[in-house]
Amino acid sequence: MKNVSRIIIFIVAALMCLGTASCMKDTTIQYYNKTMGNVNGSTFVSDQGNIFHVVEQEGTVYEELLKTERAYILCDVLNKTVGGQDNEYDIKLSAMVKVLTKDIITLETEKTEEMVKEDPVNVKNIWLSGGYMNFYIEFPIKKGSETPHLINLIQQETTEGYLFKFTHNAYGETMEAYPNDEFDIAGGYISFPINTVVKENEANLRVEWTWYKTYGVITSTETEIKGIEGTYKKDGFEHMPKTQTQKTMAVIR
């Protein structure tokens, strides 16, 4: 009888555990969702068109988000917003990185020597989303310097499609001007609204920039023109790269 009683107690306990687990079932839609988008009032609208309401946060990251216009965020998508649209969700915001936004300098814009300077800049990634051409960039800065480097995307004359030059004014803080051990690497995210320039539903794009030549793992102080080209589609969407997490430094303007 003692064995029977023990078995019955075990079964009851197991059923209670199952019941508790069922009641505490995790309804989170997606963990560790990374996306880029714009802050709209108290909400975040991703480049995919999803509307996110922050109902939980880590620390004071939501307050930091509200101080920006565009950001890259890390969040858990908890559930669909009650009474909301099909693309409306409640999220737990874990982290955010500010994204600098600037207008493209068009053919009609009067240019200055300052804005067209072509100091080396390493364009790590380019992608199109939400009507923006987005970049993740890196460049050397002199250790301890607070000089903001100037970044621009400048439209160029071309006979076919669209050609843009990604420019960087380092204000003298280049690798050839100082020994390598006097530099840190800075950078981050920057977005340019592409729909303000490209009006077609589909068009060929090319972006060029200047960076240092590399020989294996050795970076030279010689420079070269690098570039990438592809097809722009007005309603297209490209997911942002998942590898970069470095914050956009205050040394970019």
Please provide the spans of the model-predicted regions.
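Bacterial N-terminal signal peptides that target proteins for export
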Residues: 1-10
